[in-house]
Amino acid sequence: MNAKIALTETTNIKEPEPVTTATATKENAFAGASDALGAGIDALFADQGAQYSLIPLDMIQVKTQIRESFEDEENTLEDLAASIKVRGVLQPILLRSNSEGYELIAGERRYRASKLAGLEQIPAYIREMSDEEAEDAQMAENIHRKNLTQIEEAKKIQRDLDKLGSVDAVLEKHQKSRPWLSKMLALLNLPEQAKRLVIENVSADVEVINTVKMVEKINPVKAKELVDDLKKTRGKENARDKAAAVKEEVKPSKKPKADNGEKTPKGRSHEELGQLDVFAGAKFDPFSDAHNGSESPRPLILSPVDVLNRAYTNIFEHGNSPKTILETMPKDEKDRVEGWLHSFYDAGKSVNQDVGRSVIQGFRNGTFSSDGDGAFALVAFLHGVESAEFHLLNVFGSVRK
């Protein structure tokens, strides 16, 4: 029997009775609840044998929930109630028994909408759990639904962008800012550890997600450790502060030291070759303009390197238009990126001989690369060598497949 029940008319509702697909195991019935809720409440009981019942709504007590808002302009309770009248309650809510009946743990929006729809009963899973387990379940469910909402919103924005063909038109339609648009679209292309924040219901905070992305780009191992820690301390400690601290930990030193034949620090190898410092004016510190995380929850400021690495992924790996990337980029980020790349353009203009040697030097010291920010730096440098007019769109367009 399908574990999802459709309740379309109150006249069709039977007396409360358990509906069982398999015998549920009581021992450790709540183990792994926070993880399982990542796929919805149904997933919580998939391995145990789902057991749910039709419970009268007037037997359910609703106590103070973590969630305070149950609707917005695009997701009203009236809309959900109308859907329930047609399709029924497709996902059971989660309850635990108490002396007066049942206490609602997760699914208050469905509970409220069912009352609006005129239902008398609702499908529910009933589980024994401690106060701590109940709070964890509420938090995991709320993070899960917020992430789903944000990702669906990001997909809708992308569809609007494709349809309208103009960033300004999308901003006007949604009455939002460019930084908001950039952050929302970034949710559609998350690396592994940042994606875990969403899939495993660790966080729905876009700032935390973006910070983990920055850490993961530099040190994937540290990013995994960070996500594991955030998952373990979810709801108990400040996630933004934790993420910002790890970002500070992994960012490169401004003045690395060479020792005993180790690789010469970035941007200094040319001195050993007796070469002219063609990159003297170029900006190498990838976090020189980044927010240090000490004043959370101040808005996150991405460094030029982070912005360029994100842009490279979107252009080269996902095939997005360079023009669209630049149009969606917040003005402050674009200004920093332009200044950063222009320094390499100026370095290229200063080279009057042996361009090949300068390029090799750039690859040796890590300034240039075949991908990421190093690829953009190389393109800007070569544009300077050729004395071509500097245009961000031309630089970005050069990294396409």
From Swiss-Prot:
Q: Does the keyword Oxidoreductase apply?
A: no
Record flagged with keyword DNA-binding: yes
Query: For this UniProt entry, which residues form the secretion signal?
Result: none
Give the keywords, sorted. Answer: Chromosome partition, DNA-binding, Plasmid
* One Pfam family recorded for the sequence: ParBc
Region Disordered: start-end pairs: 232-272
**Which superkingdom, per the lineage?**
Bacteria
An example of a Gene Ontology cellular component annotation for this protein is:
chromosome
MF terms (GO), sorted A to Z: DNA binding
Tell me, what is an example of a GO biological process annotation in this record? chromosome segregation
User: What's the family?
Assistant: Belongs to the ParB family.
Under PANTHER family, the record lists: CHROMOSOME-PARTITIONING PROTEIN PARB-RELATED
Q: What is this protein called?
A: Probable plasmid-partitioning protein ParB
Q: Look up and give the organism this protein is from.
A: Xylella fastidiosa (strain 9a5c)
